[in-house]
Swiss-Prot record:
<feature type="transmembrane region" description="Helical">
    <location>
        <begin position="294"/>
        <end position="314"/>
    </location>
</feature>
<feature type="transmembrane region" description="Helical">
    <location>
        <begin position="109"/>
        <end position="129"/>
    </location>
</feature>
<feature type="transmembrane region" description="Helical">
    <location>
        <begin position="160"/>
        <end position="180"/>
    </location>
</feature>
<feature type="transmembrane region" description="Helical">
    <location>
        <begin position="132"/>
        <end position="152"/>
    </location>
</feature>
<keyword id="KW-1003">Cell membrane</keyword>
<dbReference type="GO" id="GO:0048034">
    <property type="term" value="P:heme O biosynthetic process"/>
</dbReference>
<keyword id="KW-0472">Membrane</keyword>
<keyword id="KW-1133">Transmembrane helix</keyword>
<keyword id="KW-0997">Cell inner membrane</keyword>
<comment type="pathway">
    <text>Porphyrin-containing compound metabolism; heme O biosynthesis; heme O from protoheme: step 1/1.</text>
</comment>
<dbReference type="InterPro" id="IPR044878">
    <property type="entry name" value="UbiA_sf"/>
</dbReference>
<dbReference type="InterPro" id="IPR000537">
    <property type="entry name" value="UbiA_prenyltransferase"/>
</dbReference>
<feature type="transmembrane region" description="Helical">
    <location>
        <begin position="188"/>
        <end position="208"/>
    </location>
</feature>
<keyword id="KW-0812">Transmembrane</keyword>
<protein>
    <recommendedName>
        <fullName>Protoheme IX farnesyltransferase</fullName>
        <ecNumber>2.5.1.141</ecNumber>
    </recommendedName>
</protein>
<dbReference type="GO" id="GO:0005886">
    <property type="term" value="C:plasma membrane"/>
</dbReference>
<dbReference type="InterPro" id="IPR006369">
    <property type="entry name" value="Protohaem_IX_farnesylTrfase"/>
</dbReference>
Length: 331
């Protein structure tokens, strides 16, 4: 009985079981290769970077050019990633039916599409935003395709720790789009995404470790096992919580309100991290942490924007005044 239970807990799952929308929505081949499900979170952290600037909110045309250019660059990065990894995808049952391995799209059409997206993205950002935002966006694209996909991913179990820089660049793009420079707030959100990424991705890697093992990709769960991975996730989870609260001090306004609203997000994150550390072989716990980690980062960016609303700023100032009056009463 114990043996059968263990097999049930550790049985590998498909990505479709982790992200239920994959079951319901069959994407066209041309849309599948650009990995559209990854783009919304990248745009959310871009907006988060904007909200940390004194110049928030941005004029609508500049906001549209920033998000449009970012989405196109992310699409190009996704397509180039699919091109690079098509041989690996052929060898994994989970990915063998993707557009390139199955022959539904040709390599040349995907490459041309990626180049077109990159050129239009750069044109939008240079003409509608600024050269710094355009340069950072191009840096993010190159770091994802060259640094992470081509160099780090097949060589080291710490690939996502260093390769995570690609996913952390959008806050820098947002900050530079708003102010023309990055600033302390942009660097803070960049750092937060960097430390959040390993905990987020390794939870997924636990679920898909057999896929990675079958093609020789040295993800941490395949190299060191789920127990070591769960401990590493715990370290990065606590770092994420610590860094997230520093946002109280880098927000131009509304920092106290942001910190208060962040409490339940961090409490839930630590709860799920602890549950996985207690039983790293329970795939339901890894799945729960992976899903929550996505909502967590969306939530942080949402709170950054909410904290910059005028009504939030007024409420934040009233809270500070109340705390001061309360402290004076005890002095």
């Amino acid at each position: 009985m114990v043996s059968s239970t263990s097999e049930l807990i550790t049985q590998p799952v498909n990505r479709e079981e982790v992200v239920p929308s994959r079951k319901r929505i069959k994407l066209p081949a041309w849309l599948e290769v650009v990995k559209p499900r990854l783009i919304p979170l990248l745009l959310a952290t871009t907006v988060g970077g904007m909200a940390l600037s004194e110049e928030w909110p941005l004029p609508s045309p500049r906001l549209a050019c920033t998000l449009g250019g970012g989405a196109l660059a992310a699409a190009a990065a996704g397509a180039l990633n699919c091109l690079w990894e098509q041989d690996l995808d052929k060898r994994m049952k989970r990915t063998s039916n993707r557009a390139l391995p199955s022959g539904r799209l040709s390599q040349s059409s995907v490459f041309i599409g990626a180049v077109a997206c990159t050129l239009v993205s750069s044109a939008l950002l240079v003409s509608g935003v600024n050269c710094l935002a355009a340069g950072l966006t191009l840096l993010g694209l190159c770091s994802y395709v060259l640094l992470y996909t081509a160099f780090l991913k097949p060589r080291t179990s710490q690939n996502i720790v260093f390769g995570g820089v690609a996913g952390a660049i959008p806050p820098l793009v947002g900050a530079s789009a708003a102010a023309g420079h990055i600033g302390l707030g942009g660097w803070w959100l960049f750092s937060l995404v960097m430390v959040w990424t390993p905990a987020h991705f390794w939870a997924l890697a636990i679920l898909l470790k057999e896929d990675y093992r079958s093609v020789g990709i040295p993800m941490l769960p395949t190299v060191s096992g789920p127990f070591v991975t769960a401990k590493a996730i715990s370290v990065y989870g606590y770092l994420t919580v610590f860094l997230s609260f520093l946002g109280c001090f880098v927000l131009p306004e509304g920092g106290l309100l942001y910190g208060i609203l962040l409490l339940p997000y961090n409490s839930r994150l630590l709860q799920l991290v602890s549950r996985l550390r207690d039983n790293p072989e329970d795939l339901d716990r890894a799945k729960g942490l992976f899903r929550w980690s996505i909502l967590y980062m969306f939530g942080v960016c949402f709170l950054l924007v909410i904290s910059r609303l005028q009504v939030s700023i007024v409420f934040n100032d009233q809270l500070i005044a109340l705390i001061k009056d309360f402290s004076i009463g005890f002095s």
